[in-house]
A protein has these predicted regions:
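Claisen-condensing/thiolase-fold acyl-transfer catalytic domains that form or cleave C-C bonds
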Residues: 1-16, 116, 120, 138-216
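Alpha-helical metal-binding/catalytic segments enriched in His/Glu/Asp
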Residues: 4-8, 29, 69
Length: 216
């Protein structure tokens, strides 16, 4: 869920140390096999109600791909700038969502509850590390699992819903690709202006939470 943000962070550190001049970050997500295998299991007459519920989240997954080029600031001085970010973990909850190529088993209720607790800790760290104040951030690009999860984050942090572009209704949960795809769509719509501060937010299985900033 956070692989693209993690990739940006690793690349950013390498660029700052002068180890590389450019970095290409690429993510591709496909859910076709998961759909087929999940539906086959859900048709089994021996499936219990609990097993059925645990399989449901797999059907919210979507397909998508994105790529981003990062460079040292002196090579592209007028480009948007990645300011870095913070990450926090709560690995005691590592069993809430487990998956592989053909199956994902999820406790959606506990994932939401514990994920939001971790997000609150991460947001507090972002305030200290990057001087975040909700009203001073122009857009919030959120890794989107569902309307319930997105609305919970908006409510918890007091975010203006108009600053959160949602794509899950059309694309589903496209995992790590959701953050760069939302960012790209905002650019296409002309919503990103030079100097604007854009927050990138994501909660992933593990549990892990990352928050970062781009200055356009």
């Amino acid at each position: 869920c956070l692989a693209f943000l993690n990739g940006m962070d690793v690349a950013g550190r390498m660029l700052e140390r002068g180890e590389i001049d450019y970095a290409l970050i690429v993510d591709g997500e496909t859910a076709n096999m998961v759909y087929q295998k999940t539906l086959a299991r859900m048709k089994s007459p021996d499936l219990t109600e609990e097993q059925f519920r645990n399989e449901l989240a797999s059907l919210t997954l979507g397909c998508g791909a994105a790529a981003m080029v990062l460079s040292r600031v002196e090579l592209c001085p007028d480009a948007p700038r990645y300011r870095g970010g913070v990450t926090r973990s709560a690995t005691e909850w590592n069993t809430l969502c487990r998956g592989n190529l053909d199956r994902m088993v999820t406790d959606t209720r506990m994932l939401l509850i514990e994920g939001m607790k971790l997000a609150a800790k991460t947001f507090a760290a972002a305030r200290l590390a990057m001087g975040w104040a909700v009203e001073e951030l122009d857009e919030f690009v959120v890794h989107q699992v569902s309307r319930v999860h997105t609305d919970a984050m908006i409510k918890a942090f007091g975010i203006d819903p108009k600053k959160v572009m949602t794509i899950f209704a059309e694309h589903g949960n496209i995992g790590p690709a959701s953050v760069p795809i939302v960012l790209s769509k905002l650019k296409e719509m002309g919503r990103l202006k030079k100097g604007q501060r854009i927050a990138l937010l994501g909660i992933g299985s593990g549990l892990n939470c990352s928050m970062a900033e781009v200055v356009w």
